[in-house]
Amino acid sequence: MLRRKPTRLELKLDDIEEFENIRKDLETRKKQKEDVEVVGGSDGEGAIGLSSDPKSREQMIIDRIGYKPQPKPNNRSSQFGSLEF
């Protein structure tokens, strides 16, 4: 394998300005997200507290991810199909 000489990277003024703009944008998004969490936390729909019961926590997770569990039937025909003994 041929080895190349290292290429020199130069930092330009445009690169620095772009970095600063992106960093400011990320900081404003983070502050907005924190503000929403603070407002949502007072309604009870924000972060899950430690004192909440497991059913409500489970229900909040189900609502958040959109999972709708279907109960499984407990009869033998559903477990073994149409096999006869």
Swiss-Prot record:
Bias type Polar residues, positions: 73-85
Coiled coil: 7-38
Any single Gene Ontology cellular-component annotation: anaphase-promoting complex
GO biological process, one term: protein K48-linked ubiquitination
Stored Pfam families: ANAPC_CDC26 (PF10471)
Annotated keywords: Cell cycle, Cell division, Coiled coil, Mitosis, Nucleus, Phosphoprotein, Ubl conjugation pathway
Phosphoprotein among keywords: yes
Pathway note: Protein modification; protein ubiquitination
Region entry Disordered, spans: 30-85
UniProt-listed InterPro entries: APC_suCDC26
Entry's localization field: Nucleus
Residue(s) carrying Phosphoserine: 42, 82
Similarity comment: Belongs to the CDC26 family.
Role, per record: Component of the anaphase promoting complex/cyclosome (APC/C), a cell cycle-regulated E3 ubiquitin ligase that controls progression through mitosis and the G1 phase of the cell cycle. The APC/C complex acts by mediating ubiquitination and subsequent degradation of target proteins: it mainly mediates the formation of 'Lys-11'-linked polyubiquitin chains and, to a lower extent, the formation of 'Lys-48'- and 'Lys-63'-linked polyubiquitin chains. The APC/C complex catalyzes assembly of branched 'Lys-11'-/'Lys-48'-linked branched ubiquitin chains on target proteins.
Subunit comment: V-shaped homodimer. Interacts with CDC16. The mammalian APC/C is composed at least of 14 distinct subunits ANAPC1, ANAPC2, CDC27/APC3, ANAPC4, ANAPC5, CDC16/APC6, ANAPC7, CDC23/APC8, ANAPC10, ANAPC11, CDC26/APC12, ANAPC13, ANAPC15 and ANAPC16 that assemble into a complex of at least 19 chains with a combined molecular mass of around 1.2 MDa; APC/C interacts with FZR1 and FBXO5.
Identification of the protein by name: Anaphase-promoting complex subunit CDC26
Species for this entry: Pongo abelii (Sumatran orangutan)
